[in-house]
Amino acid sequence: MNTNIGIIDYGMGNLHSVQQSFKRLDQSIRIVKSPNDVHECNALILPGVGSFDPAMENLRRTDLIPKIKSWVKDGKPLLGICLGLQLIFESSEEGNSEGLGLLKGKVCNLPRNTKERIPHMGWSLLKQIKECPLLDNENTSRWMYFVHSYSAIPSPEDLAATVSFGDSEVTAIVWKDSLGACQFHPEKSGKSGQRLLSSWLKWLHEKNSDLS
């Protein structure tokens, strides 16, 4: 079975950079703007740059929210990136809108009792908490590029990796079943980001082979 990946276009995502990253991995990405665009896909990407409430409002306008919820409920793969990670939770301190509620938990301000600047911007090293398809088993450094002012507080069993912020560890990757998300930008994280996307792609190919 071919791997057909769709990236959700709701006006607040860095689509071109993500597409280029997958192009370097010889994987094409199709644009998803409406529920009808999802039919040919067997994996989805939810990117995001900006603020929580406008993002949820834009998603509502696409009529994709029910489709995204049923997609994840059916165990189909979805990858959230940056703001996309925050949107899959129930709520955010940044706004008043309900999130997608695909994972239990909420999004909170980054810790203020630190000398670290907010937004957290730049390269940081991941600390793996549990195995997940986004992280390969190679013993290599995982420096990723972050730009964010808020951090998700997931259920402990859904936390896959953290990153240091001052004296705190904040969420970097979450994973549950076939739903995963990263707070950083893999498409802007050089070889480390490419390796992460390649790991996800390999997992997708294996998953699709099992279904064919």
From Swiss-Prot:
Active-site residue list: 82 (nucleophile), 185, 187
GO molecular function: glutaminase activity; imidazoleglycerol-phosphate synthase activity; lyase activity
GO terms for biological process, alphabetical: L-histidine biosynthetic process
Keyword Transferase among UniProt keywords: no
EC number(s) recorded for this UniProt protein: 4.3.2.10, 3.5.1.2
Keyword Translocase set for record: no
Catalytic activity: 5-[(5-phospho-1-deoxy-D-ribulos-1-ylimino)methylamino]-1-(5-phospho-beta-D-ribosyl)imidazole-4-carboxamide + L-glutamine = D-erythro-1-(imidazol-4-yl)glycerol 3-phosphate + 5-amino-1-(5-phospho-beta-D-ribosyl)imidazole-4-carboxamide + L-glutamate + H(+); L-glutamine + H2O = L-glutamate + NH4(+)
Any one Gene Ontology cellular component term annotated for this protein: cytoplasm
Pathway: Amino-acid biosynthesis; L-histidine biosynthesis; L-histidine from 5-phospho-alpha-D-ribose 1-diphosphate: step 5/9
Domain Glutamine amidotransferase type-1: start-end pairs: 4-210
Annotated SUPFAM superfamilies: Class I glutamine amidotransferase-like (SSF52317)
Gene3D superfamilies reported in the protein's UniProt record: 3.40.50.880
Subcellular location: Cytoplasm
Keywords linked to the UniProt accession: Amino-acid biosynthesis, Cytoplasm, Glutamine amidotransferase, Histidine biosynthesis, Hydrolase, Lyase
Function: IGPS catalyzes the conversion of PRFAR and glutamine to IGP, AICAR and glutamate. The HisH subunit catalyzes the hydrolysis of glutamine to glutamate and ammonia as part of the synthesis of IGP and AICAR. The resulting ammonia molecule is channeled to the active site of HisF.
PANTHER family on file: IMIDAZOLE GLYCEROL PHOSPHATE SYNTHASE SUBUNIT HISH
Subunit and partners: Heterodimer of HisH and HisF.
Protein name: Imidazole glycerol phosphate synthase subunit HisH
